[in-house]
C-alpha cells in the first residue's frame, strides 16, 4: 500500500489486515500507552479545512508510535496565500517528513498529493469525496461493537449527498458478503448516483425518506453539512429534518454511530444509552490511525 487515498484503492484483505493491526495497536494502548515503531519519524499534517477529531487523533497516533508531528491548520500562515500550488507544497513537505496526512476542500486533492509526494500520503478528507481513515475506524467499530461485518444490516441517515464518510463506508461494505443498507435522506441529499452505481448489485440497497430502523444492526447518523451548500437557504430547508431520540431507539439491539461533529441530529439524551457508541467510535480513531501509519511506513521502506 503506497498511499491511502480512496477505499476503491484497497481490497478486502488489505482492510482486514488493517483491522487486525488496529487490534494490536489498541492492545498496546491499553497495556503501555505507547510504543517506538515510528521513533524518529515525522508525520506532516496539512489541514486546509477545519478538523478536531481527525487531526488530533492523527497527531496522537503518531506520538503514541514514538514519532513527531509537523504541519499547519491555518493556510493564512502558509505560502498558499502567495499562490503556491498544492503540487509544489507537497513536493517540498514530502522532503521534510516520512508521512503526510492531508485534508483539503477540493475533490481529488489527496490523489494529486500522492502523485507529487516522495512519501506515503493519507487522505484525511477531500471535499465531499472520500475519507478512508474514517471508514476504516468505522469498520473497526462495527467489528468490535457488533461482532461482524459480513451479513451486516445498516441504516445511513441524513446527508448522504455530501457525506464523504458515507460514500467511503458504502464502498468498503460492498466488499463483504450479505450486507444490507438502508439509505434514509431528504430528496435534496440523496446518495450520489455514481456511488449507488458503484455498489449496486454487490449489496442489498433500499432508499427512503422516513426513518426506519427496525431490524438493523447499526444506525449511522450524519450531520447536515452547512458548509457544503452553495445556497444557505437550501440548507435551512433540510436542517434538523432528522433527529434521533430515545423514543426511536427504545430497547432495540442496535449500535448507534456518528462520525461527529453532531449538531442536532442526535438528542443528547441518547448519549447515556447503551446503544450509543459514537464517542467510543471516535476513540477507535487512535489505534486505527496508528495501524495505518505503521503499515504505510513499513511498506514505504521495503
From Swiss-Prot:
GO terms for molecular function: amino acid binding; aspartate carbamoyltransferase activity. It catalyses: carbamoyl phosphate + L-aspartate = N-carbamoyl-L-aspartate + phosphate + H(+). Carbamoyl phosphate binds at residues 53-54, 103, 131, 134, 260-261. Keywords: Pyrimidine biosynthesis, Transferase. Its EC number is 2.1.3.2. L-aspartate binds at residues 82, 164, 223. Pfam families: OTCace (PF00185), OTCace_N (PF02729). It comes from the Archaea. Pathway: Pyrimidine metabolism; UMP biosynthesis via de novo pathway; (S)-dihydroorotate from bicarbonate: step 2/3. GO terms for biological process: 'de novo' pyrimidine nucleobase biosynthetic process; 'de novo' UMP biosynthetic process; amino acid metabolic process. PROSITE patterns: CARBAMOYLTRANSFERASE (PS00097). Heterooligomer of catalytic and regulatory chains. Catalyzes the condensation of carbamoyl phosphate and aspartate to form carbamoyl aspartate and inorganic phosphate, the committed step in the de novo pyrimidine nucleotide biosynthesis pathway. Belongs to the aspartate/ornithine carbamoyltransferase superfamily. ATCase family. This is Aspartate carbamoyltransferase catalytic subunit. It comes from Methanococcus maripaludis (strain C5 / ATCC BAA-1333). The gene is pyrB.
Amino acid at each position: 500500500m503506497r498511499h491511502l487515498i480512496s477505499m476503491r484503492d484497497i481490497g478486502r484483505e488489505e482492510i482486514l489486515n488493517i483491522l487486525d493491526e488496529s487490534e494490536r495497536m489498541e492492545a498496546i494502548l491499553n497495556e503501555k500507552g505507547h510504543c517506538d515503531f515510528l521513533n524518529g519519524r515525522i508525520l506532516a499534517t496539512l489541514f486546509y479545512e477545519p478538523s478536531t477529531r481527525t487531526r488530533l487523533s492523527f497527531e496522537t497516533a503518531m506520538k503514541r508510535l514514538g514519532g513527531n508531528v509537523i504541519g499547519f491548520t491555518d493556510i493564512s500562515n502558509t505560502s498558499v496565500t502567495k499562490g503556491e500550488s498544492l503540487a509544489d507544497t507537497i513536493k517540498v513537505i514530502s522532503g521534510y517528513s516520512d508521512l503526510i496526512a492531508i485534508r483539503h476542500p477540493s475533490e481529488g486533492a489527496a490523489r494529486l498529493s500522492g502523485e507529487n509526494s516522495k512519501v506515503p500520503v493519507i487522505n484525511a478528507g477531500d471535499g465531499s469525496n472520500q475519507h478512508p481513515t474514517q471508514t476504516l475506524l468505522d469498520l473497526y467499530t462495527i467489528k468490535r461493537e457488533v461482532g461482524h461485518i459480513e451479513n451486516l444490516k445498516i441504516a445511513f441517515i441524513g446527508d448522504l449527498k455530501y457525506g464523504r464518510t458515507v460514500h467511503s463506508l458504502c464502498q468498503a461494505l460492498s466488499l463483504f458478503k450479505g450486507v444490507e443498507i438502508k439509505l434514509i435522506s431528504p430528496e435534496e441529499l440523496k446518495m450520489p448516483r455514481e456511488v449507488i452505481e458503484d455498489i449496486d448489485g454487490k449489496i442489498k440497497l433500499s432508499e427512503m425518506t422516513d426513518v426506519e430502523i427496525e431490524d438493523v444492526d447499526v444506525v449511522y447518523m450524519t450531520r447536515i453539512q452547512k458548509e457544503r451548500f452553495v445556497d444557505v437557504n437550501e440548507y435551512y430547508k433540510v436542517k434538523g429534518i432528522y433527529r434521533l431520540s430515545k423514543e426511536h431507539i427504545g430497547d432495540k439491539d442496535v449500535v448507534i454511530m456518528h462520525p461527529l461533529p453532531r449538531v442536532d441530529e442526535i438528542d443528547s439524551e441518547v448519549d447515556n444509552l447503551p446503544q450509543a457508541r459514537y464517542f467510543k467510535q471516535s476513540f477507535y480513531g487512535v489505534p486505527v490511525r496508528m495501524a495505518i501509519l505503521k503499515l504505510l511506513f513499513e511498506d514505504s521502506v521495503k
